[in-house]
UniProtKB/Swiss-Prot annotation:
InterPro entries: GlmU-like, MobA-like_NTP_Trfase, Nucleotide-diphossugar_trans. Its EC number is 2.7.7.107. Mg(2+) 2 binds at residues 145, 226, 228. It holds the Pfam family NTP_transf_3. The keyword Transferase applies. This is 2-aminoethylphosphonate cytidylyltransferase. It comes from Lancefieldella rimae (strain ATCC 49626 / DSM 7090 / CCUG 31168 / NBRC 15546 / VPI D140H-11A) (Atopobium rimae). Mg(2+) 1 binds at residues 116, 226, 228. Cytidylyltransferase involved in the biosynthesis of cell-surface phosphonates. Catalyzes the activation of 2-aminoethylphosphonate (AEP) to CMP-2-aminoethylphosphonate (CMP-AEP). Can also use phosphocholine, with much lower efficiency. Exhibits strong activity towards CTP, limited activity towards ATP and no activity with GTP. PANTHER family: NUCLEOTIDYL TRANSFERASE, PROTEIN LICC. Pathway: Phosphorus metabolism; phosphonate biosynthesis.
Length: 246
């Protein structure tokens, strides 16, 4: 695609995964990629980009696939943004989006972010984490969603679905330069394996969890929201309530 630029090494990087179909947000996603759906006046992905820019991130690689042309305006609006195309988004899970931007990991410390988030606190990435981490929200009770198990020192020892009274994944993470380079190597290795097509990128992290130094960076519910359905969107932005009546 013409609007996708080449890559240059930068000091601090970010990868935003924006290639997916967003089928649970239909009918809106039939014509608009989920990250570009406006929530209270701002496209979701722009709340993520704004927070990264506020934190001084120099290069933000937005990995696109579905309706990719609609993201081109971001390169004009944000000098730090570079679009990277994921040509495998229909055939493979989101491991393919990280692999499409694996060169970013090889260049240094990197934030990895989902694109379909609403970040209300533009300072969520400040101060910059001092070590590799997943941002997580503490919860009570049991959930079947993605969670983290921690050891007594606070190090993450498992990433997976299902857990009780721990931290839930919110779609943001940070890898120090050494860990980012390790993750790049793990991604290359995973891509050689049969069945990698079904993997989430977090599965690769979990498979090598002992080789990475990952902790939790706690966040509060009012700082960030992940909207997975039209009902959740309508609860967050009442301008979409009409969709619940159709």
């Amino acid at each position: 695609m013409a609007c996708v630029k080449g890559s240059n090494a930068e000091k601090t990087n970010a990868i935003i995964m924006a290639a997916g179909l967003g089928t649970r947000m239909a009918p809106l996603t039939k014509t608009t990629p989920k990250p570009l759906i406006s929530v209270n006046g701002t496209p979701m992905i722009e709340t993520v980009i704004n927070a990264l820019v506020t934190a001084g991130v120099e290069r933000i690689s937005v990995v696109v696939g579905y309706l990719k042309e609609q993201f081109c305006y971001l390169e004009e609006r944000y000098p730090a943004v570079v679009l990277v195309e994921n040509t495998e988004y229909l055939e493979k899970n989101n491991i393919s989006s990280i692999y499409a931007a694996v060169d970013v990991l090889e260049q240094g410390a990197t934030f990895i972010c989902e694109a379909d988030l609403v970040i209300s606190d533009e300072h969520i990435f400040q101060p910059r984490p001092s070590r590799s981490c997943y941002f997580g929200r503490k919860f009570s009770g049991h959930t079947g969603d993605w969670v983290f198990d921690l050891d007594d020192s606070g190090k993450i020892v498992r990433i997976g679905k299902g857990g009780s009274d721990t931290y839930a994944m919110v779609g943001l993470s940070y890898f120090s330069a050494p860990d980012a380079k390790r993750l790049a190597r793990f991604m290359h290795d995973a891509y050689k394996e049969t069945g990698h097509e079904q993997l989430f990128w977090d599965d690769v992290v979990n498979n090598h969890i002992a080789e990475l130094d990952l902790s939790i960076h706690p966040v509060e519910a009012q700082q960030i929201a992940e909207l997975d359905s039209v009902a959740e969107l309508a609860a967050f932005d009442h301008g979409y309530v009409y969709l619940l009546r159709s």
